[in-house]
Curated annotation (Swiss-Prot):
Keyword terms: Dioxygenase, Hydroxylation, Iron, Lyase, Metal-binding, Multifunctional enzyme, Oxidoreductase, Pyridoxal phosphate
Region (Pyridoxal 5'-phosphate-dependent lyase): 56-535
Organism ancestry: Eukaryota, Fungi, Dikarya, Ascomycota, Pezizomycotina
E.C. code: 4.4.1.-, 1.14.11.-
InterPro entries referenced in this protein's UniProt entry, alphabetically: 2OG-Fe_dioxygenase (IPR018724), Cys/Met-Metab_PyrdxlP-dep_enz (IPR000277), PyrdxlP-dep_Trfase (IPR015424), PyrdxlP-dep_Trfase_major (IPR015421)
Its biological purpose: Bifunctional enzyme; part of the gene cluster that mediates the biosynthesis of flavunoidine, an alkaloidal terpenoid with a tetracyclic cage-like core connected to dimethylcadaverine via a C-N bond and acylated with 5,5-dimethyl-L-pipecolate. The tetracyclic core is synthesized by the terpene cyclase flvE and the cytochrome P450 monooxygenase flvD.
Gene field: flvA
Pathway: Secondary metabolite biosynthesis; terpenoid biosynthesis
Name of this protein: Bifunctional enzyme flvA
Keyword Metal-binding tagged: yes
Modified residues (N6-(pyridoxal phosphate)lysine): 331
Length: 823
């Protein structure tokens, strides 16, 4: 890729040189005509030009191989010194600074990553564009007295129209360059006109088609064309729009001939989940040799197969229709630089005057300053990039398809070679199996899961519209076609070495998404005919009796596992629960933990546990919580389906509900103890310690959690010292807010430590206070982590509660849950 960018930069330098040459000619012409010039403005131009030259030379150094530095730099200096006509006085001393390059090469960037190369080129391109239009006018003068009103000397006494909306000479040069790059063929002597966007291109074509057709004429479109193109066509009351029944050429031809269509619109590759394709080559061969087609128009949107077809050479025969081709050039043709909106229309030469006039009248031209931002590519660079993108997309498709068939259908049009295209684009689509998984709100969560997985894999990825970028991009796309659902669209990046990592990130993300999006609700009622269920009930009754007596009970994970299985927890969910803490969100208040929170409703009246809508979490000093954020509502990332629909988590809540049911505790102020039901805030927390960060499970020191019944469950740890995470239960007399290390030993009622998976501690929160020791590292060179579940269960709030809020008792809209209670 560095070779490609060195070639582009070489042409970029030629364009800079052309700007300097234009400036020299402009200045010479002004002198010849006796025109006044503003030296202050010119000094700004020259300062910026000097800056551009210097930055370009530095960028070129960063792109060079490690050998040959001095020779190449000396060549740069020679070229810079070659500027003349008075420029030497302004740039005096610049060559001296450049000459310092070969003695200070260590100060230059080495091994630039692709995103850095693109970012720096963008910056240089913007500066060059500014210089190119610095003195130019939108409406340059033909002649003048005393002051100049042009920059490009070709405008002086020009026979054409000096008006930027009519396309400047620079725009016409770019049009020719782009036509040569696309290699669309030579039949009908095609010409290219640049437009301000892809939709501007379609607008111009649509107006031309409407001008050529009569009231009541029919237009046939393939079963799908891009929705923003189809909608304005359908709204034309003077025309009848008919969709062909199939994407095969024969179906499209049959529809056109049956309806006597005057125009046919085709998308060779469609923006649909199936990436439906049309064999344009076969279509062209059939119609060009078929009577009645010479008077028809064929309009082709090649955006997704940019420059991939010898289109005009395929339309070769005695009955060849007029072919108009267009693209959104915001996509592939800009090499992923994303600098401007752009589009173009290609047409037979004899249609140029009519199309050009429409462009002028509608103001859809690509103006000169924007045209100068298009990268100076050629067919070699473009074909190399498109080939690389397609190869990467095919590889990603194979990797995803092999591992995700039970979750989704992954699509890429591998048959592009059969159509004699040069490439197959870089788009891969994903359609999930299962009801509801392809709804937009759910797919947005899928994108979030994939991005978080990409962060964990350390690979670059972007969520956003469009395609053809160097960095892999994901997006929830919508074809707006026959009531079809949205789908996940992946625009695969250009760096081949990243594809396997990208695949791992995408697979990890969609696995999390599928786990979280498919509701799984534990049903204790199905266990009533299993003897193990009643053995578990007897064990829990013993624990419940101890809890009612002692107000605290520690349940070892080894004891809990068969209990939870007897309640219906699935075997595979035990392992999954130990992994869920890898995917938590950032804590908004402290830097030593990641977290998720969800609100659940223990409905003892209807004997069910439900998920409720998110609400902010607040603890106050009045509830024995004394910290810097006491009384402040905290907005935590939400618990997702990967935890909520884990049957072990659901069984833990059922077990807690069974043990705490009808165990009276010291009431808290302004909670509704007349209600038989409880709210349970569930937290999934990872506390970590690493360099300069000490993980504090209870930064607030000795405290209470504003609950009636608190349960803490251990999920796992890494690199944690044996004196970490020790829980102390303190007498109510202990001072709230003091560190655990300062607590009075005589007021410590109990000491527990979670050591093994699912070790759980349940205590009456308002009858004691508690604190924990910090998380310490066993190996100080590595991060230490401690993963926990926290269940804070209380009665609903009443007006006057110290938090200043009451509970919003609403079921969750996108993550419903209804787990039966057996009590």
């Amino acid at each position: 890729m560095h070779d490609v960018w060195r070639t582009i930069l070489s042409r970029f330098k030629q364009n800079t040189n052309a700007i300097k040459t234009r400036f020299d000619k402009y200045r010479a012409l002004c002198k010849e005509l006796g025109l006044q010039r503003d030296e202050w403005s010119e000094s700004i131009f020259l300062d910026d030009l000097e800056k551009l030259l210097k930055l370009t030379a530095k960028f070129e150094m960063a792109l060079m191989p490690s050998n040959g530095v001095d020779t190449h730099v000396n060549g740069v200096i020679t070229k810079i010194n070659g500027f003349n006509n008075g420029f030497d006085t302004h740039i005096n001393g610049f060559d001296t600074r450049i000459n310092g390059f070969h003695t200070h090469t260590n100060g230059f960037d080495r091994g630039l990553e692709l995103w850095q190369i693109e970012e720096r080129y963008r910056a240089l391109a913007q500066l060059q564009s500014t210089l190119g239009s610095f003195f130019e006018r939108a409406c340059p003068g033909y002649d003048q007295s005393k002051i100049p009103w042009f920059f490009d000397p070709s405008y002086y006494q020009c026979q054409g129209v000096n008006y930027d909306r009519f396309a400047s000479p620079d725009v016409r040069d770019r049009e020719q360059q782009l036509l040569e790059t696309l290699q669309l063929g030579s039949n009908q002597n095609p010409k290219l006109l640049l437009m301000s966007s892809g939709m501007a291109s379609f607008t111009v074509i649509q107006q031309y088609v409407v001008q050529q057709l009569n009231y009541g004429d029919t237009v046939v479109v393939s079963p799908y064309i891009y929705f923003e193109s189809f909608q304005p066509m359908r709204s034309q009351k003077s025309l009848t729009v008919v969709n062909a029944k199939g994407f095969d050429p024969e179906s499209i031809i049959e529809a056109a001939e049956r309806n006597n269509a005057r125009a046919v619109f085709l998308d060779p590759m469609c923006n649909t989940v199936g990436l439906d394709t049309i064999d344009i080559r076969r279509f062209a061969h059939l119609v060009a040799n078929r009577g009645g087609w010479a008077d028809r128009l064929v309009i082709v949107d090649g955006t997704l197969v940019s420059g991939g077809m010898q289109l005009y050479d395929w339309f070769d025969g005695p009955h060849c229709p007029k072919v108009l081709y267009y693209e959104s050039a915001h996509k592939y043709i800009q090499l992923g630089l994303d600098l401007i909106m752009c589009g173009y229309v290609v047409m037979p030469e004899d249609l140029v005057p009519a199309i050009q006039l429409i462009r002028q009248i509608t103001g859809t031209v690509l103006y000169s300053r924007n045209a100068s931002l298009l990268p100076p590519i050629d067919k070699t660079i473009f074909n190399f990039r498109m080939s690389r993108l397609t190869t990467n997309a095919e590889k990603l498709h194979r990797l995803l398809d092999a591992e995700s068939r039970n979750m989704a259908e992954v699509t890429f049009p591998h048959h592009w070679r059969d159509y004699r295209w040069r490439h197959g684009g870089n788009v891969v689509t994903v359609r999930f199996h299962g009801e509801g998984l392809n709804k937009r709100s759910n797919l947005e969560r899928c994108c979030d899961d994939i991005l978080r997985a990409a962060e964990e894999e350390g690979v670059q990825m972007v969520k956003g519209a469009s395609l053809g970028f160097s960095t892999t991009r994901i997006f929830v796309a919508d074809a707006f076609f026959e009531n079809t659902d949205p789908f996940l669209r992946i625009s695969v990046g250009v760096q081949s070495e990243d594809i396997e990592t990208v695949a791992r990130a995408v697979l990890s993300g969609i696995k999390r998404y599928c786990m979280s999006a498919v509701p799984v609700n534990l049903d204790v009622g199905q266990r009533l005919y299993d003897a193990k269920f009643y053995i578990a009930m007897a064990s829990m009754l013993e624990v419940r009796a101890r809890y009612a007596k002692d107000r605290v009970v520690f349940m070892e994970g080894e004891w809990l596992v068969p209990i939870l299985k007897a309640l219906g927890a699935r075997e595979e969910d035990f392992d999954a629960l130990q992994q869920v803490s890898h995917h938590l969100g950032k804590d908004p208040t402290v830097d030593y933990r990641t977290i998720r929170n969800g609100l659940f409703y223990f409905n003892f009246e209807n004997k069910a546990i439900q998920r409720f809508q998110k609400q902010r979490f607040t603890l106050t000093v009045q509830e024995n919580y004394k910290r810097h954020d006491s009384g402040l509502p905290r907005d935590f990332p939400e618990v997702r389906g990967d935890l909520q629909y884990n049957t072990v988590l659901q069984a833990l809540m059922v077990a807690k509900a069974f043990i705490m049911n009808k165990v009276d505790v010291e009431p808290r102020a302004h909670l509704d103890y007349s209600s038989p039901n409880f709210l349970c805030n569930v937290f999934n927390i990872r506390t970590f310690t690493e360099k300069n960060i000490l993980g504090e499970p209870t930064l607030e020191g000795v405290h209470a959690d504003g609950a009636d019944h608190t349960m803490t469950t251990f999920l796992g740890c890494t690199n944690m010292r044996s004196d970490s995470g020790i829980t102390f239960i303190h007498d109510q007399k202990e001072i709230t807010g003091i560190p655990a290390t300062e607590a009075q030993p005589s007021l410590i009622k109990h000491r527990f430590q979670h050591r093994h998976f699912l070790d759980s501690l349940l205590f009456a929160d308002n009858e004691a206070k508690h604190s924990l020791t910090s998380v310490f590292q066993e190996d100080v060179s590595k991060r230490a982590t401690r993963d926990m579940l926290l269940f804070l269960t209380r009665k609903p709030k009443l007006a006057g509660h110290s938090s200043g809020s009451v509970d919003a008792m609403e079921p969750h809209k996108t993550l419903p849950m209804n787990v039966p209670l057996w009590l």
